């Protein structure tokens, strides 16, 4: 394919922005990172240095980018949840193609504004529902399309977030409050609902959901617990100990985005200071969090097929686990291995996922790389069909989440058609 190299701007140089920038370096013949906008100096300067970005293309605010004439092909939006829709609309109006981290917006109106903006300005939009692009997803869909289990009847899908990851992001961290970010289902698991819909291959019609902030509450705080882990006499016995999460992981390695996000420039002194003064050193029972720590979502599709999704914050971290029940067999999978059981033959066939999906950059089982590459290939060939998570598809997925939240809060079953009529 004789196509040009695509130039991309990164908005938000945190964990997700850094991942996409690093993935771009694996495909230098297809793309390059030409600019970055990030308010935090350490993260901004690090990404700029690693990608040799010219000083004139290094910005502390994304608004500054738009003061210049268009100088890149696309933008990757990896800002905080409540900072996705505004830049998406603005960059669409300036003719940039857009790859945006989920969620597209935090309510139906925000999502619709983004979709209308990209359609009006004839730019491509891809939303990072990365699980659609994972290697095992392609294998699963191929098995199902070839009739491996007959007609899909029901799906069970579990996301064990992991107790320490949940505490980091949704109790102490940036996604702990709905008014500052979004509900946990939207922030963490929208691509799970999207993936279920993609696997079933049908439109969701009805949703119900249950969940709450059951455990990470002040009334569950042990009697002798301190406000901060560094002062707490129970720290060594607590599974949510901040020193164990951050300090020990820093000392033992390897360093990951969770440790790095605590203080930016890593040193033992900086981590201790962050735990003493910042949000990540707080007792998990003494935070200002309000998002649910567990949730189930029940889905009914137009065909009559059903699915249940479970988000477990208090859990051992592990791969997502799925069971797909069909009329002629069932599939069990965890992202690394697929088990196909035939009712007729009473036999299990095991399928290992191809090794090339387990590279150092195989986030979401290769889905992150696949999502970025499909977006760039769409731009290089002027072929939006290469994007499988475009505007209307993503809008439907977001409405599934919004319906689930209405159900959870109002204690009722919600029809998806209700969302199409909701306007502020």
Where are these regions (language model features)?
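Rossmann-fold dehydrogenase core element
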Residues: 113-130, 150-155
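N-terminal Rossmann-like dinucleotide-binding module
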Residues: 1-53
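Catalytic cores of eukaryotic secretory-pathway lumenal/extracellular enzymes that build
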Residues: 15, 81, 85, 113, ...
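Short, Asp-centered acidic motifs that coordinate Mg2+ and/or phosphate
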Residues: 35, 74, 154
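Beta-loop-alpha module in the N-terminal Rossmann-like domain of NAD(P)-dependent dehydrogenases
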Residues: 53-117
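C-terminal helical cap and adjacent loop that interface with cofactors, partners, or active-site loops
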Residues: 19, 51, 291-424
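Predominantly a Rossmann-like dinucleotide-binding segment in NAD(P)-dependent oxidoreductases
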Residues: 131-281, 411
């Amino acid at each position: 394919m004789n196509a040009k190299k695509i130039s991309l701007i990164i908005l938000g140089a945190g964990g997700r922005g850094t991942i996409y920038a690093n993935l771009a370096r694996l495909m230098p013949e297809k793309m390059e990172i030409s600019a970055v906008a990030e308010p935090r100096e350490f993260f901004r300067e690090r990404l700029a240095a690693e990608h040799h970005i010219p000083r004139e293309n290094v910005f502390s605010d994304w608004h500054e980018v738009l003061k210049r004439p268009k100088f890149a092909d696309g933008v990757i939006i990896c800002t905080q949840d409540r900072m996705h829709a505004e830049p998406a609309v603005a960059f669409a109006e300036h003719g940039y193609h857009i790859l945006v981290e989920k969620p597209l917006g935090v309510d139906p109106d925000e999502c619709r504004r983004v979709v209308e903006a990209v359609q009006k300005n004839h730019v491509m939009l891809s939303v990072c529902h990365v699980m659609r692009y994972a290697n095992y997803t392609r294998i699963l869909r191929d098995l199902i399309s070839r009739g491996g289990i007959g007609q899909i009847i029901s799906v069970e899908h579990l996301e064990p977030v992991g107790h320490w990851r949940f505490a980091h992001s949704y109790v102490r961290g940036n996604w702990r409050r709905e008014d500052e970010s979004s509900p946990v289902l939207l922030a963490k698991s929208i691509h799970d609902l999207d993936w279920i819909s993609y696997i079933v291959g049908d439109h969701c019609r009805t949703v119900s959901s249950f969940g709450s902030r059951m455990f990470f509450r002040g009334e569950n705080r042990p009697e002798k617990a301190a406000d901060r882990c560094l002062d707490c006499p129970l720290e060594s016995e607590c599974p949510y100990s901040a020193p164990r999460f951050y300090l020990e992981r820093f000392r033992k390695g390897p360093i990951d985005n969770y440790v790095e996000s605590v203080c930016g420039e890593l040193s033992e002194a900086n981590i201790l200071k962050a735990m003493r003064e910042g949000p990540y050193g707080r007792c998990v029972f003494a935070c200002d969090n309000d998002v649910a720590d567990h949730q189930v979502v029940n889905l009914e599709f137009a065909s009559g097929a059903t699915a249940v999704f479970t988000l477990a914050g208090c859990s051992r971290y592990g791969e997502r686990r799925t069971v797909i029940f069909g009329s002629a067999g069932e599939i069990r999978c965890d992202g690394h291995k697929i088990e196909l059981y035939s009712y007729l033959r009473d036999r299990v066939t095991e399928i290992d996922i191809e090794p090339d999906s387990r590279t150092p950059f195989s986030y979401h089982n290769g889905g992150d790389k696949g999502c970025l590459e499909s977006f760039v290939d769409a731009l290089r060939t002027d072929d939006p069909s290469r994007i499988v998570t475009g505007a209307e598809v993503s809008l439907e997925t977001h409405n599934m989440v919004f319906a689930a939240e209405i159900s959870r809060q109002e204690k009722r079953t919600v029809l998806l058609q209700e969302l199409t009529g909701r306007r502020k």
